[in-house]
Amino acid sequence: MSNYHFETLQLHVGQEQADPASDARAVPIYATTSYVFHNSQHAADRFSLADSGNIYGRLTNSTQDVFEKRIAALEGGTAGLAVASGAAAIVYAIQALARQGEHIVAQKTIYGGTSNLLAHTLPQYGITTTFVDAHNLEEVEAAIQPNTKAVYIETLGNPNSDIPDIDAIAGIAHRHGLPLVIDNTFGTPYLIRPIEHGADIVVHSATKFIGGHGTTLGGVIVDAGTFDWAGSGAYPWISEPNPSYHGVQFTKAAPTAPFVTYVRAILLRDEGACISPFAAFLLLQGTETLSLRLERHAENTKRVVEFLVKHPMVESVSHPSLPDHPDHALYEKYFPNGGASIFTFRIKGGREEAFKFIDSLKIFSLLANVADVKSLVIHPASTTHAQLTDEELANVGIYQNTIRLSIGTEHIDDILADLDQALNAVK
């Protein structure tokens, strides 16, 4: 279906015809842990990867399979793997690339959970990270060491929606024989397809825009199918016979998608952060309206940014659509259809004024999620980034008067009225 437009792909990929067992047009929920093999040879072929069908619910599920194919198609990749959460997708992507004594280069302005993973959790297992200013290409390249195994960035940073030059960073990574891993959670494949700009692996928290309704946890890894794992020689667990899987060479068993096949066959098998068929079904419902929702998110965000910039209680707004934003040119290059509906602004005052504003809102919900159809708000310095010192917070552009907004799809007049009354309550 590669010739179809995005809006068609989001509805049909993975289930081009009605369900063969029931003639159901909607994707069924396959609530099963296991699958019957036709005979002993059929079972052996499944386990050797000679046959790519279902083995066990921790690895694959027919509902999950449709979701994986659909997201991979929307991203322009060769295959996808759905897992239990966005955090699981990120952990698996890094674990599949780096071992004890090895190293990652990462953008410093990334999601706080990912930053904590790279800065504190993975070093306990011997994997270290150098955090860099992704806008400083010389700094990015200088951070690469002989033991570096990947470069990791986000299409839109969290929480300030800063934008790296993906094409340039991909060039640096590939010049050093490294895969580029990109978190496209905030970008979504509707607004930007990182693979077209050089990404080798794309990860998502499907909990966010893909699901879109704040109901379901899930994560996705997409294999671009472009990285030369065999030629690299730096990832023998993918390119050479793997002793934990009967000597399978994933580059030969799954030549178009060896990376996600390795993650599924080894890491998901052993660590088990699998997605449930119910979650996959709910995320499919979100996927089918992704383009419609993103258009409304973008329209509403534009109006909110224009409103905040002019409000006397607002000190500054960090949104790349603004001409004076340092990433404005990159925003126009990579996001011609708009976006960045998760962004921050600084209220005049400090922590007390920020709390007063947040507690005065009526439509906006105070919670840790983002990218919901409902508008959301949070104070990053005391919540999502609370583990950072004031110096570390400032280093990633967060202050005590910083407020993160996630603009939903409510009527724009109601959103603006709520923001206005809450800002006026602080005066």
Question: Whereabouts are the PLM-identified features?
Answer:
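Conserved N-terminal alpha-helix of the aminotransferase class I/II PLP-enzyme fold
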Residues: N39-A88, G113-T121
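Conserved small-domain helix->loop->beta segment predominantly found in fold-type I
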Residues: E271-C274, A279-A280, Q285-T289, L294-R296, ...
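Active-site beta-loop-alpha junctions enriched in small/polar residues
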Residues: L156, T185-G187, L322, K348, ...
